[in-house]
């Protein structure tokens, strides 16, 4: 330490804390704080350059190495500031070799040989200052730029429901309607199927109507109507030419039955006449019974 108290040593009395603060800087206006290490630039706007570091009060304890090394370049006239127990020592025109010797003697730290000339990004500053554990924060211009990019990108995102009326109109014109309302293709197919079935049923009804208009079929052997027999059967003249009884006789024996033993077939008119005669006969019998009862009394 004797060679550092040389010709240009100046002692300044001030208020400081126990950690020794060593500053190696250029001629300029700088503000040194033990906690935050704030640096103010020169009034002319130029960036003065220098090296600043904190040296612990106990050299043997490596846990107290909470220091900073800020590089601002090397020029001819450099200052070395030592603060210890409230006293500040300032030395002018100190070579980097002497500062290196002091750092090695006190803290075992070395000054990098090639020091950057300008202050870089916060990440680079933290790496130079030895504060790798501190969180990285973007500067204000970078944050503004990122916010602007995010807002521009957000403008491209459209979360609103935009209604394209032209497209909707084309779709509406292509869709099928029933009584003015939209219907699906399935329902339209069902409707077409139902209309087809209705048409088929109507056609069958028309066929039935035409069938009712056909002449009544009679048995060609006995003259029995098709309505009076269970079914018409095949005969020698073809299908549906014989009544049920004649057709069975023909199918089993190959001959037609004898009509002399069979009562004549009764037509519906004959049946109605027989019913009327039976009713009249019953009425006469009832009258006779009532007459006999009155005579006995």
From Swiss-Prot:
One of its GO terms (cellular component) is nucleus. SUPFAM superfamilies: Glucocorticoid receptor-like (DNA-binding domain) (SSF57716). A zinc finger (GATA-type) spans 213-269. Residues 190-201 have a biased composition (Low complexity). Keywords: Activator, DNA-binding, Metal-binding, Nucleus, Transcription, Transcription regulation, Zinc, Zinc-finger. It comes from the Eukaryota. Predominantly expressed in shoot apices, inflorescences and roots. GO terms for molecular function: identical protein binding; transcription cis-regulatory region binding; zinc ion binding. Residues 143-185 form the CCT domain. Disulfide bonds: none annotated. Residues 178-203 are annotated as: Disordered. It is found in: Nucleus. Pfam families: CCT, GATA, tify. GO terms for biological process: regulation of DNA-templated transcription. Residues 73-108 form the Tify domain. Transcriptional activator that specifically binds 5'-GATA-3' or 5'-GAT-3' motifs within gene promoters. Belongs to the type IV zinc-finger family. Class C subfamily. This is GATA transcription factor 24. The gene is GATA24.
């Amino acid at each position: 330490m004797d060679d550092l108290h040389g010709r240009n040593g100046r002692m300044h009395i001030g208020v400081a804390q126990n950690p020794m603060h060593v500053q190696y800087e250029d001629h300029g206006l700088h503000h040194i704080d033990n906690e935050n290490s704030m640096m103010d630039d020169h009034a002319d706007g130029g960036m003065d350059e220098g090296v600043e570091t904190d040296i612990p009060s106990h050299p043997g304890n490596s846990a107290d190495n909470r220091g900073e090394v800020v590089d601002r370049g090397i020029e001819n006239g450099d200052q070395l500031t030592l603060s210890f127990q409230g006293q500040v020592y300032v030395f002018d025109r100190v070579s980097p070799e002497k500062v290196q010797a002091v750092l090695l003697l006190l803290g075992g730290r070395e000054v990098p040989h090639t020091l950057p000339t300008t202050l870089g990004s916060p990440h680079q500053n933290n790496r130079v200052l030895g504060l790798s554990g501190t969180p990285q924060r973007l500067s204000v211009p970078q944050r503004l730029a990122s916010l602007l990019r995010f807002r521009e990108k957000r403008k491209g995102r459209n979360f609103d429901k935009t209604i394209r009326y032209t497209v909707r109109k084309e779709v509406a014109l292509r869709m099928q309607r029933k009584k003015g309302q939209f219907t699906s293709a399935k329902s339209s197919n069902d409707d077409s199927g139902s209309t087809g079935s209705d048409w088929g049923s109507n056609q069958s009804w028309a066929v039935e109507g035409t069938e009712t208009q056909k002449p009544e079929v009679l048995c060609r052997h006995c003259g029995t109507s098709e309505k009076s027999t269970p079914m018409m059967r095949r005969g020698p003249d073809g299908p549906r030419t014989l009544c049920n009884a004649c057709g069975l006789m023909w199918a089993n024996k190959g001959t037609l039955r004898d009509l002399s033993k069979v009562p004549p077939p009764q037509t519906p008119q004959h049946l109605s006449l027989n019913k009327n005669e039976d009713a009249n006969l019953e009425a006469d019998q009832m009258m006779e019974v009532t007459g006999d009862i009155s005579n006995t009394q």
